[in-house]
């Protein structure tokens, strides 16, 4: 049986090297023949030990982000410049790449991504899941109404952590260029960077994926509203937010599966120091969060967190 290649793209700085290793190790472990993957890693200045560690796990093709690209992004302490790298995929990927699967580093893959890769885009520029925390463009922390005039009230809002992208459609329709222009216009007000920009400028050019391909890691906790159907067979779990399982002990059903994969890769990369802040966030997540979540959500929706 001839192998078939899945093009995977990721973007990190050194701080996210370890979770990227976990995500790629879990992805490779779940991938079934005839699929194989080639990983395009967008970065600014990753250290050689980090690149070597990742390359020991997968077929790695590093791509350096140029100053020309990064110069179009706002300097924001909340995000590393690499966070918006998906917007540069149409100009940085090899010309023969027609489809690419972009994955955030803070994920755990639990099922074969072959069916995800084969998803029918139905003529749209990309596929993604509806963001469970921001289900509509008009939801709190979605696209501000003053900016998103013309977007229907019921337009869904996508999470950019998993995106199956038609690269040629992005080029021809100027998807990334429009998003970059949006970021440039409202640099001091943009909230979720490229995710907000894509939802604001191309809200009608993406198609939804099954939620199981980008499930919040809080599935099963008393405050989580994820549907039972989506939670029954998770394909990819997303550790979005401040609770990062490579830095701290966390609560929830995916803490142990993550720890098992982490143990397989941790020695391949430079060690990361844990801080007192990590310890306090861990304590909050494991002991207090189930009871304090309504307040957390209240603060988050008002962009105070």
Over which residues does each language-model region extend?
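A glycosyltransferase accessory/donor-loop signature
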Residues: 1-12, 22, 160, 165-305
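Short, acidic, metal-binding catalytic loop of nucleotide-sugar glycosyltransferases
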Residues: 26-35
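Short internal beta-strands
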Residues: 37-45, 128-130
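GT-A fold catalytic core of metal-dependent nucleotide-sugar glycosyltransferases
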Residues: 62, 82-138, 164-165
